[in-house]
Amino acid sequence: MSTNPKPAFRRILLKLSGEALMGDEGFGIDPKVLDRMAQEVKELVELGIQVGVVIGGGNLFRGEGLAKAGMNRVVGDHMGMLATVMNGLAMRDALHRAYVNARLMSAIPLKGVCDDYNWAEAISLLKSGRVVIFAAGTGNPFCTTDSAACLRGIEIEAEVVLKGTKVDGVYSEDPMKNPDAVKYDEVTYAEILEKELKVMDLAAFTMARDHDMPILVFNMNKPGALRRVIMGEEEGTLIRAKKVI
């Protein structure tokens, strides 16, 4: 397969799950995984790609158990937002150590820790070649970090939301449970809904669909996969309004 000489995308929103930062650990952040991800983002910056990043918080906080024990959902979601800020701080530090200029913006004010989210400033920073990490989700409870990724992607006019996961695309069934599950190279928004394929929560997915924001699902744990996606090689599963034949 021939490699495209130029990147397929100019500006992207990279969504990473908090769990991806755990590596083989059961909790927290694996420094080796963090540094590898920072190096992969650095490769994109060196290619001239404008990179926005949203990271989940599931490696540091999971509210389901506490919610079942009676914790208020709003309180739990606020704690989850703070977990994404912690991951964002770690990623910003890893990027700085890799000599990549990065800015951390939070949807909730955290004076002295990171900048407040500002749409116009974020776009200006991206144009100047800085990586912008968007933390604290949307700043609202009841909204997932997938929703935050789609929202920020739409706001910064990214060409695609890249969703880094533990699997290398979208399958007909859970490949962890059924080894005969079929992987899709490309699928439409309508097919995802019709076949009830698991990509992200419905609110996030319909936001992307309504604003014609393509989503590309790939395995962030696979070395080099992110670069292959950016160069337009066959990697992961592309979701958009219509298939290109």
Curated annotation (Swiss-Prot):
One annotated GO biological process: UDP biosynthetic process
Matches recorded under NCBIfam families: pyrH_bact (TIGR02075)
Assembly, per entry: Homohexamer.
Activity regulation, short description: Allosterically activated by GTP. Inhibited by UTP.
UniProt KW keywords: Allosteric enzyme, ATP-binding, Cytoplasm, Kinase, Nucleotide-binding, Pyrimidine biosynthesis, Transferase
Catalytic activity annotation: UMP + ATP = UDP + ADP
Keyword Transmembrane helix attributed: no
Designated name of the protein: Uridylate kinase
Region Involved in allosteric activation by GTP, residue ranges: 23-28
Localization annotation: Cytoplasm
